[in-house]
Amino acid sequence: MTDLRHYDVIVSPVITEKSTMVSEHNQVVFNVARKATKPEIKAAVEALFGVKVTAVNTAVRKGKVKRFRGLIGRQSDVKKAIVTLAEGQSIDVSTGL
């Protein structure tokens, strides 16, 4: 049974040219909560998608500085998780949870 906390950990799938390329190597890319840890991300992916996760790599993309009408603002930082799945496992990220 999935815990409601798992839905707070995984924010959205990342669908870019680079994430499509790594999907050929049994990897899936997600935007995750800023405070999520690797064990939490692993547990959430295994519970929500029913797959076996072998590794989780994370990276924090710093937000860009933007200007609007002379005011300087900053976009939020985004944490990205590259999840490696066990051999033969796959996730279709084009469908919803």
Curated annotation (Swiss-Prot):
Protein name, per record: Large ribosomal subunit protein uL23
Matches recorded under NCBIfam families: PRK05738.1-3, PRK05738.1-5, PRK05738.2-4
HAMAP family noted in UniProt: Ribosomal_uL23_B (MF_01369_B)
Domain of life: Bacteria
Assembly description: Part of the 50S ribosomal subunit. Contacts protein L29, and trigger factor when it is bound to the ribosome.
Keywords: Ribonucleoprotein, Ribosomal protein, RNA-binding, rRNA-binding
Acyltransferase keyword on record: no
Entry function: One of the early assembly proteins it binds 23S rRNA. One of the proteins that surrounds the polypeptide exit tunnel on the outside of the ribosome. Forms the main docking site for trigger factor binding to the ribosome.
Gene: rplW
GO biological process assignments: translation
SUPFAM superfamilies, per the entry: Ribosomal proteins S24e, L23 and L15e
Family the UniProt entry places it in: Belongs to the universal ribosomal protein uL23 family.
Bilayer-spanning residue ranges: none
Pfam families to which the protein is assigned, alphabetical: Ribosomal_L23
Gene Ontology MF, one: structural constituent of ribosome
GO CC list: ribonucleoprotein complex; ribosome
